């Protein structure tokens, strides 16, 4: 078993660390089986499995936190269950029932409790549920057998900068999803489609690529692997389109913005509107909230300076602090978002 004595919990990367157990559940003969616990990190797949040839693979990401009170909290896991189901229906996979999903999440966290970073470290236990089609298919058709796996790993911030401003780049020759394609579902192929833009952005010194809408190349879409929002005055504005994945973090931040007395708008956001933004950030389970100081349109050499001094703005800071406080149990859970793991 992994020795935890020398782990620096406050400086964890966002990467894989071997933990003790993962949990699995298989759909076969028209029904879901029992939850299985294993220490095996590998999956034995048929060489013609539909996940390998026709992209029947979906996944989720959520986190468990240890509070000052010592209690373990999951943040809105039922929303991840619903989104996984929606993704499954989108590419003709078998939706995992919500009660099984929640039981698997609680079980895998409890089994790996010693890997939950301590309160105050800034790190968390990341859960990665993944569903794959495992039945052999040579012709293009959905499988009739599926496996759901949930593994966990302790992680630090997704971006090495942490909660500090970063710069992002726009490249028009890349799309992460088609206008009526899989962008609204958490399908692995969406992330493969974005790797080229991300690699190019990082090679140029930026933290991520900001995608434009795939139809007109006019409106803001997603930012790297996350949603995006701007603040104008007292208004929280986030892009809305059928190619954007509904972010649970973004949904939560919108409610927090209302709680803080802000207006909220979800609508198409033209790239040029960045010139009017007072603050900007990307948001998601992995990134939580990653502030952005500048967006560079690489094709037109236009620089949208959002933070002149490179510092995080007050509204993004307040949103981030409130969200983190709820997740850690430091602020009352007024909306019933937290699920305890006993």
Q: Predicted regions: what is each one?
A:
Residues 117-128, 132:
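Extended, Lys/Arg-enriched charged tracts that mediate electrostatic binding to polyanionic substrates
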Residues 1-108, 130, 137-342:
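Helix-start/capping segments and mature chain N-termini
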């Amino acid at each position: 078993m992994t020795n935890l004595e020398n782990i620096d919990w406050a400086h964890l990367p966002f990467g894989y660390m071997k933990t003790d157990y993962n949990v699995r559940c298989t759909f076969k003969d028209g029904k879901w089986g029992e939850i299985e616990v294993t220490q095996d990190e590998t999956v034995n797949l048929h060489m013609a499995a539909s996940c390998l040839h026709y992209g029947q693979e979906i996944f989720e990401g959520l986190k468990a936190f240890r509070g000052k009170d010592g209690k373990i909290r999951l943040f809105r896991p039922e929303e991840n269950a619903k989104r996984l189901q929606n993704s499954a229906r989108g590419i003709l996979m078998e939706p995992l029932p919500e009660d099984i999903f929640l039981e698997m999440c609680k079980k895998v966290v409890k089994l790996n409790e010693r890997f939950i970073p301590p309160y105050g470290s800034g790190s968390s236990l990341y859960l990665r549920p993944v569903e794959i089609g495992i039945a052999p298919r040579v012709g293009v058709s959905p499988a009739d057998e599926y496996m759901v796996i949930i593994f966990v790993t302790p992680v630090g911030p997704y971006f090495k900068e942490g909660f500090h401003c970063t710069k992002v780049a726009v490249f028009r020759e890349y799309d992460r999803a088609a206008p009526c394609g899989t962008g609204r579902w958490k399908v692995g192929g969406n992330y493969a489609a974005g790797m080229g833009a991300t690699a190019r952005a990082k090679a140029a010194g930026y933290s991520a690529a900001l995608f434009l809408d795939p139809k007109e190349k006019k409106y803001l879409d997603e930012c790297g692997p996350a949603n995006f929002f701007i603040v104008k005055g007292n208004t929280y504005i986030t892009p809305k389109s059928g190619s954007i994945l509904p972010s649970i973090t973004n949904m939560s931040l919108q409610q927090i913005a209302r709680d803080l007395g802000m207006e909220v708008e979800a609508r198409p956001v033209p790239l040029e509107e960045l010139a009017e933004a007072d603050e900007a950030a990307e948001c998601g389970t992995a990134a939580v909230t990653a502030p952005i100081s500048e967006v560079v349109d690489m094709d037109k050499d236009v620089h949208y300076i959002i933070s002149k001094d490179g510092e995080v703005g007050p509204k993004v800071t307040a949103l981030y602090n409130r969200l983190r406080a709820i997740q850690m149990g430091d602020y009352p859970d007024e909306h019933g978002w937290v699920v305890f793991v006993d």
